[in-house]
């Protein structure tokens, strides 16, 4: 179910049974962390496949995050990249979720008639690498930030947009995050700004 009201969303995640589910997601029945970090940037796609299978079989991993997947594809042929994506699809069929963090192609800076920089919205065509990765995704989410903005608030804001979501069909703007440099904390931007206004 889609919860659009932020207060309702917070109330939902604070329910005792949801807190218990979050703990269950984070820890196994012995209180051990469920997360395993694998740093395999220099390995071949074949060695990464083997490591992923090890994570699934040895550690019973149900969620694999590849960040960034673009690094794995450097110096690989299109055929090798496509083969790796097919491998990921077989893993998904076994009940494992895959999150591929994908860098974007750097587009040219565009300006309007007055010379002001135009920040354009991203599309699935902006994802760097093999197009099968984007086409195969169950949900494609873009996170963008205007690092060159003159306003510090805008410079530290990241906008989230759902470009595709197979299970719900809901797409579009999904919210913004604000990174506060003073506290080194990431906030929901709307909540942070509301809190700032109420402090004055």
Annotate each language-model stretch with its function.
Residues 1:
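Phosphate-binding active sites in nucleotide-utilizing proteins
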Residues 96, 100-103:
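Conserved H-loop
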Residues 66-67, 102:
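Active-site flanking residues adjacent to catalytic metal/cofactor-binding acidic residues
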Residues 4-36, 45-66, 78-79, 90-94, ...:
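C-terminal regions of RecA-like/P-loop NTPase motor modules
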Residues 71-74:
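Residues immediately C-terminal
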Residues 87:
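Short, conserved SAM-binding segment of the class I
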